[in-house]
């Protein structure tokens, strides 16, 4: 069997195409079982279980906004400038990415601001980035509207990253050079971002990591959101623990079946969040404490 933490939407499409081969060979493959994708997919499934029909569905993670929005900063520090993760990020904020519009997979430029109204916390904006979640969730959750993966950023960061993406698209800088500029931005790059940041909406009080859906309950429109209230302290552990728990489910036959599956289709949610709660910081007692689901009638 097979489990990975792939966060690239293009290989995800290719791997989903191997579903029949996996079934014929009695192989169970769980793809994208990290933090995002991974936990994000499971939160999205919890959102969809609250709704009778699903119109829009978004998964959201922090770049440099929110309590634990330091993933990119830590990656830069630990790799003295750049890394495979930063190079991959530059690929996903330039060119075009696939996401879901009106229930269909389409290609669009990244770094588009999407405003979400979070029940009880108000509205804030995230920015589209190339990721697997919308492509697998559209099929597994029956989305009729829009779906994308969003990043939470400070306005100046959004301006800087958007400008980097434009320079990549115009052939003025390479993916690799852009990745280096993330860790060591030029004075001109910082100045341009500072001058244009007012045009980029903020995350405001949105939580750092959540799934958000809009749909119907009893023929009435609702917004539902699910977030984790604690997590492991660093990007590597927040990615590794979900993979380890998925492997445990494979070994204990909690995740059963054959074929290629995204996390939302195959993972035992109760067991997963009970286990994840115990390896978070601060540790939580179980699924009921580490997951918070809220909803609001529109």
Question: Model-predicted segments: where are they?
Answer:
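Short, surface-exposed basic-aromatic patches at helix termini and helix-loop junctions that form
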Residues: 19-24, 46-52
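Short, glycine/charged-enriched secondary-structure capping and boundary segments
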Residues: 16-19, 44-45, 72-75
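Short alpha-helices
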Residues: 31-43, 48, 242, 246
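Short gly/pro/ser/thr-enriched loop/turn and capping motifs at secondary-structure boundaries
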Residues: 8-13, 36-39, 62-68
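C-terminal catalytic/substrate-binding lobe primarily of soluble NAD(P)-dependent oxidoreductases
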Residues: 49-298
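Rossmann-fold NAD(P)-binding glycine/threonine-rich loop
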Residues: 5-28
């Amino acid at each position: 069997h097979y489990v990975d933490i792939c966060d690239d939407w293009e290989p995800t499409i290719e791997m989903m195409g191997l579903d029949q081969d996996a079934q014929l060979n009695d192989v169970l493959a769980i793809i994208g079982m990290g933090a995002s994708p991974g936990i994000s997919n499971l939160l999205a499934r919890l959102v969809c279980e609250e709704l009778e029909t699903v119109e829009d569905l978004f998964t959201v993670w922090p770049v440099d906004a929110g309590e634990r929005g330091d993933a990119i900063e830590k990656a830069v520090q630990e790799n003295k400038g750049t890394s495979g993760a930063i190079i991959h990020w530059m690929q996903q904020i330039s060119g075009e990415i696939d996401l879901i519009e009106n229930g269909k997979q389409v290609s669009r430029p990244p770094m588009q601001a999407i405003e979400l109204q979070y029940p009880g916390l108000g509205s804030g904006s995230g920015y589209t980035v190339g990721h697997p979640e919308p492509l697998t969730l559209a099929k597994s959750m029956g989305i009729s509207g829009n779906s994308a993966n969003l990043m939470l950023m400070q306005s100046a960061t959004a301006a800087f990253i958007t400008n980097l993406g434009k320079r990549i698209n115009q052939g003025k800088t390479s993916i690799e050079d852009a990745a280096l500029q993330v860790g060591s931005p030029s004075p001109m790059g910082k100045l341009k971002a500072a001058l244009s940041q007012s045009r980029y909406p903020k995350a405001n009080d949105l939580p750092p990591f959540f799934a958000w859906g809009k749909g119907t309950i009893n023929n009435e429109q609702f917004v539902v959101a699910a977030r984790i209230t604690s997590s492991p302290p660093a990007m590597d552990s927040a990615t590794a623990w979900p993979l380890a728990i998925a492997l445990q489910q494979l070994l204990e036959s909690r995740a059963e079946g054959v074929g290629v599956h995204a996390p939302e289709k195959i993972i035992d949610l109760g067991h997963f969040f009970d286990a994840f709660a115990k390896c978070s910081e601060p540790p939580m007692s179980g699924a009921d404490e580490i997951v918070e689901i809220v909803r609001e009638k529109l």
